[in-house]
Design a protein with these regions (language model features):
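Nucleotidyltransferase catalytic core that binds NTPs
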Residues: 1-250
Length: 250
C-alpha cells in the first residue's frame, strides 16, 4: 500500500459571499484526512470561480477575494487558489482539474462537492468526466433529503451516455477507467485510488445558502437579517455592510 506524497483537497464555488457552511465543509474534510493520513501533507484550498455559467455574479472578483481572505484569516491550514480567477470566463471545473492533474501528477486530488452540486453534474460542462481527473468527496445537504441509494448506478448511466457522445471526438481517452466510478466507505480507501472514486460523507452541512444571505441581509424582517448575520464570519459580515454589497436597488 503506497501512501500519496501529498493530498490536495479543494472546495470550489462562487463564494458570493463565503459563509460558515463553506468553512465547516472544508475544515471537516481537512481534519478527516488528517486523521486518516497523519503522516501525509494535506493541502486544503478554496477555489473561487471566475463566473459560473449557471449563476449570476453580484460582486467583483476582487470583492470576493477580499471576503475570502477575511474569512480564512485565522484558519492556518486553509488558503485560496486563484487559478480560475486568472482566466477569462466561462471557466469550467473540468479544465481546472485537468490543469491540476498535470501540475501535480504525483498527488492525490480530492474535489469537495455538496449534495446540491453533485445532483447537478449533468448540467456541468463534462461534469461526469470529473471522475477521470479526481476523486469526489460528497457532503449531504439536509434540505435536499437523502442522497439516492442508486447514486452509483445513476452516475454509471450518465458516464456511459457521456462516453458514447464523446468517444468519436476523443479516441485517446481511457474509457474503461472513466466508466468505473466506485463509492468508497472510508477516507482510508482513497489510498492508491487517484481517480474515479466517490466518498459520501455522513457529515451534515448546515443549511446555509449564499443566495439566502444576499436576500436576507437587508431584509425588513429582523429574523432574516439576524439569520444572515449569524451565517457569516463576523469579518465578512462587517465587510458586506461597510461596502453595501447585495444592497437592493433603490
Amino acid at each position: 500500500m503506497t501512501m500519496p506524497r501529498c493530498i490536495r483537497v479543494c472546495l470550489g464555488g462562487s463564494f458570493d459571499p463565503i459563509h460558515l457552511a463553506h468553512l465547516q465543509m472544508i475544515a471537516h474534510v481537512y481534519h478527516e484526512l488528517m486523521r486518516a493520513f497523519p503522516n501525509v501533507d494535506i493541502i486544503a484550498k478554496l477555489l473561487p470561480t471566475a463566473g459560473s455559467p449557471l449563476k449570476t455574479q453580484p460582486t467583483s472578483n476582487q470583492q470576493r477575494l477580499e471576503m475570502l481572505a477575511l474569512a480564512i484569516g485565522d484558519v492556518p491550514f486553509l488558503s485560496i487558489d486563484e487559478t480560475e480567477l486568472q482566466c477569462q470566463p466561462p471557466v469550467y471545473s473540468f479544465h481546472t482539474l485537468s490543469e491540476f492533474k498535470q501540475r501535480y501528477p504525483n498527488d492525490l486530488l480530492i474535489f469537495v462537492l455538496g449534495q446540491d452540486s453533485v445532483e447537478q453534474l449533468d448540467k456541468w460542462y463534462r461534469g461526469f468526466e470529473l471522475l477521470s481527473l479526481t476523486n469526489l468527496w460528497v457532503l449531504p445537504r439536509p434540505a435536499l433529503g437523502s442522497l439516492s441509494r442508486n447514486l452509483s448506478h445513476t452516475l454509471h448511466q450518465n458516464l456511459n451516455q457521456n462516453a458514447l457522445a464523446t468517444i468519436d471526438k476523443t479516441p485517446s481517452i481511457n474509457i474503461d477507467n472513466r466508466l468505473v466510478p466506485f463509492i468508497i466507505h472510508s477516507p482510508k480507501d482513497l489510498i492508491n485510488q487517484t481517480t474515479n472514486h466517490i466518498y459520501i460523507d455522513k457529515f451534515v452541512v448546515p443549511d446555509i445558502a449564499s443566495r439566502d444571505i444576499r436576500a436576507w441581509i437587508y431584509s425588513t424582517e429582523a429574523r432574516q437579517r439576524q439569520q444572515a448575520r449569524l451565517s457569516l464570519p463576523s469579518q465578512v459580515y462587517r465587510y458586506i455592510v461597510e461596502h453595501q454589497l447585495y444592497a437592493p436597488d433603490v
